[in-house]
Amino acid sequence: MIDYTAAGFTLLQGAHLYAPEDRGICDVLVANGKIIAVASNIPSDIVPNCTVVDLSGQILCPGFIDQHVHLIGGGGEAGPTTRTPEVALSRLTEAGVTSVVGLLGTDSISRHPESLLAKTRALNEEGISAWMLTGAYHVPSRTITGSVEKDVAIIDRVIGVKCAISDHRSAAPDVYHLANMAAESRVGGLLGGKPGVTVFHMGDSKKALQPIYDLLENCDVPISKLLPTHVNRNVPLFEQALEFARKGGTIDITSSIDEPVAPAEGIARAVQAGIPLARVTLSSDGNGSQPFFDDEGNLTHIGVAGFETLLETVQVLVKDYDFSISDALRPLTSSVAGFLNLTGKGEILPGNDADLLVMTPELRIEQVYARGKLMVKDGKACVKGTFETA
């Protein structure tokens, strides 16, 4: 028999639901961190002691899934003082991020996969959903167990591996190292019931995606398990990325890169090229270092990349590129969940996790629920991380 009091039911009434598909005006019933029901009219007395939230005139959509975040900090390329700090929970939730994938960057000397794993687990305890990629720019990969395959297979939060290619900061890996790494991630994923993906940080080298094509020629890892990211950082790379997506690959556009290919422009161009939105994702590269230069190219100061560009990209897609709200949301919701095989994420459906955003008609975030818990109210975090000030 259900203990309705313990279940803590919440009924979200009257919002325009984008699940992300347009469902019109709907009610959503939530309990125990899950979506229990979605219908055009759910009576408020369907269960006793139900908290009713009137969302008339507002939009309800899935929480954002940001698959590229430097959870324990990034940077360091301009010396020790440019190492960015760990991310705070509220920076994620106030940007609408309810699920996150952490990773390392250039620095795998003073930062370690073990520390990233601890941070990932901490964020799960603080209320959102978090996973990680093992490895970093360096190849062979820095790992926890000594093996990419073991990390992915047996460590609960590890779902794949990351490396860098076509970048002066990479380890200049040859095709056989890349193929072995991707194959280990793939097999580890099979053994552990994980996606087993390989994420490639893309640099500005004119080689662009050629190392990935060489990998595909020399091993049998499916193209669907390989993800080039930062593909909008230069025009030739972006053009190659579109061709990669036409061949069946998925591409990741970085929201914090505003030129030469702005994120909304990149998504729009992909759609114009006939690429399904299911194979286009958007991520922030958040919490990494963000350098600023003067007119002579001198470094003036370094900030920390934020997450606001995710929502801004959605807004620009709707306002400037005539995207439906449904399609504008997909690269941050269902497309990411599909690529990473994140069961229960990315769609508002019965049985899925209650990761929900409440937005105004102008697409401003008002409330954020993560696994059914209210994390943001009136646009401000009402739940803070362990060491955040109230």
From Swiss-Prot:
Changing Y137 to A/F: Reduces activity 1000-fold. It is found in: Cytoplasm. Keywords: Cobalt, Cytoplasm, Hydrolase, Metal-binding, Metalloprotease, Protease, Zinc. Its main location: cytoplasm. Substrate binds at G75, G76, E77, T106, Y137, R169, R233, S289. GO terms for biological process: proteolysis. Binds 2 Zn(2+) ions per subunit. Has highest activity with Zn(2+) ions, but is also active with Co(2+) ions. It is an enzyme of class 3 (hydrolase). The modification N6-carboxylysine is found at K162. Gene3D superfamilies: Metal-dependent hydrolases, Urease, subunit C, domain 1. Zn(2+) 1 binds at H68, H70, K162, D285. Catalyzes the hydrolytic cleavage of a subset of L-isoaspartyl (L-beta-aspartyl) dipeptides. Used to degrade proteins damaged by L-isoaspartyl residues formation. The best substrate for the enzyme reported thus far is iso-Asp-Leu. This is Isoaspartyl dipeptidase. It comes from Escherichia coli (strain K12).
